[in-house]
């Protein structure tokens, strides 16, 4: 949250950062969520400038970002493809809305490669993190199988 606020601060005339997260309950997982809200400067930056300042967020790239992204590149044995990239729409004026593809699928022909991640920190238990990632993939799998 701190790195997100730090990245947004130069673009905002007002920024509200809650001191504590809330619990976001989804069908099969719980998340800690912090809703950061800001008001952009009147001449506000283009959407893609904001996306560039925010991507990758600490949630997917770690912090400090340059060091963490470098370490992930050295240790992670997979190509993330579009995982954790910005997704959304941008119009001809540069306005739009973007989110982060934290859970996504890349579908080619009859095959789908599913992506989900976990927040790895010093005290993380690898088995618990794998179980969490598996739980996060269930809605994508179910949607692809027509369960919903």
Task: List each model region and its residues.
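Contiguous alpha-helical scaffold segments within structured protein domains
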Residues: 1-73, 145-148
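Glycine-rich, small/acidic residue-mixed loop/short-helix segments
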Residues: 58-148
